[in-house]
Amino acid sequence: MDLRPEEVSAIIKQQIDKYGNKSHVDDVGYVLQAGDGIARVYGLNNCMSGELLEFENGVFGMAMNLEEDNIGCVLFRGERDVKEGTLVKRTGKTVEVPVGKALIGRVIDPLGNPLDGKGEIETEKFRPIEYPAPSVMDRKPVNRPLQTGIMAIDAMVPIGRGQRELIIGDRQTGKTAIAVDTILNQKGKDVICIYVAIGQKASSVAEVINTLEEGGAMEYTVVVSSTASEMPTLQYIAPYAGCSIAEEFMYNDHKDVLIVYDDLSKHAVAYRAMSLLLRRPPGREAYPGDVFYLHSRLLERAAQLSDELGGGSITALPIIETQVGDVSAYIPTNVISITDGQIYLETELFYSGQRPAVNVGLSVSRVGGAAQIKAMKKVAGALRINLAQYRELAVFAQFGSDLDKVTKDKLIQGERLVESLKQSRRATMPVEDQVIVLYMATNKYLMDLPVKEVRSFNKEFVKFVNSNYPEIPNEIRATGDLSSETENMLKKAAEEFKDQYLRTKR
């Protein structure tokens, strides 16, 4: 074997040049105590609040309590693998979630892991789950409508892009149905939708996903799911993760985003469970003292951004479940005071057949009125007061049969207004069709019709206008207004159709 000293010395010199004596230092601690999804960690003196911690067996947790001699850490998964003495190291970063267009059409958990069996999510973008809300100067007033396709809401409790509108009511009153119908109605409107399921049954989440797929809504929707069987930690971070995904579309793609939190009552319960296990002092209803901040910092991230920042928006629809209609409980009053209005659903209305079961008296939209289209304002202006008068008179009418003509007329019209506002699930209506129906209802064209025929009459009238007078819906769609010329045309169409309808019924 022929040895070449010059080659050997060249290789040695090369190795010496490449050699670096950099040592990698990890901040490491160990577990003092573990159980119930909580680990007490000793030795991580420089740990940040909310920092992601990695345990030696690949389990991750989040630092929540920074105490004098230890850290209270909540675990995401794998609590059985964490025992006394398990090594823990800092990651130096807070909890992040993958974001970007790759998530559209996918079902993920709050950490960004896919749950739909469609393979890994290919994205290099990440955002922290906690992010500061836009300042006052970064925002502009809400001035564009977000149509839900539900007439009772679009007419009387209008929602604008960038608004936070609470959906509140007892269980089984159609809260999720309203949110899902609103997502379905965004088809073709260039709105990205995010549905965050917190503490729901897995079967309920699967049903929602199935509804969205059937309606073609998964093409523009991301589902973040943390079911009731998950650790409270994952339920706690789910809405923040969903909001970070929405912020990526709002800040960087300048898109309009709709996010549904279903529901924040279960979110507060998960946070309460975590806080009590961490030995934080309990307050009213055993919730910790910062439960208001829990929801306010989440909902303040919804905004209509200024034109300088691209003009994107996040519209939030948080859902709260009440117990026996008690809106004065702790969490409902908190969220009512944070949001820009609420849609209150009532059990009695639901079981009496009025669906959506919106209680018009208790529902309000504080900023959406500025975003409502002019045509809707014209036809629905007196709707709320007419319905309120009808409800009041209906109560008195139960006690006496001798009513004057004005009262009888108000009762007859009220019945037909209520009937016109009824809508089935997954039967959303374009705003121009809503204007046509409400014009008919508010201008007393339905007075001499039997109540049971009102809905079929309205449906036929919309078809009649769209086929015989297409310029009416076209103008409302294009301008958002109902000019006097168009109104005259609509009046003519209404009279023509009613004559035709009554002749066929005779």
Curated annotation (Swiss-Prot):
It is found in: Cell membrane. The keyword Cell division does not apply. The keyword Nucleotide-binding applies. Gene3D superfamilies: 2.40.30.20, ATP synthase alpha/beta chain, C-terminal domain (1.20.150.20), P-loop containing nucleotide triphosphate hydrolases (3.40.50.300). GO terms for molecular function: ADP binding; ATP binding; proton-transporting ATP synthase activity, rotational mechanism. It catalyses: ATP + H2O + 4 H(+)(in) = ADP + phosphate + 5 H(+)(out). Its EC number is 7.1.2.2. It is an enzyme of class 7 (translocase). GO terms for cellular component: plasma membrane; proton-transporting ATP synthase complex. Keywords: ATP synthesis, ATP-binding, Cell membrane, CF(1), Hydrogen ion transport, Ion transport, Membrane, Nucleotide-binding, Translocase, Transport. ATP binds at G169, D170, R171, Q172, T173, G174, K175, T176. It is a peripheral membrane protein. Belongs to the ATPase alpha/beta chains family. Produces ATP from ADP in the presence of a proton gradient across the membrane. The alpha chain is a regulatory subunit. F-type ATPases have 2 components, CF(1) - the catalytic core - and CF(0) - the membrane proton channel. CF(1) has five subunits: alpha(3), beta(3), gamma(1), delta(1), epsilon(1). CF(0) has three main subunits: a(1), b(2) and c(9-12). The alpha and beta chains form an alternating ring which encloses part of the gamma chain. CF(1) is attached to CF(0) by a central stalk formed by the gamma and epsilon chains, while a peripheral stalk is formed by the delta and b chains. This is ATP synthase subunit alpha. The gene is atpA.
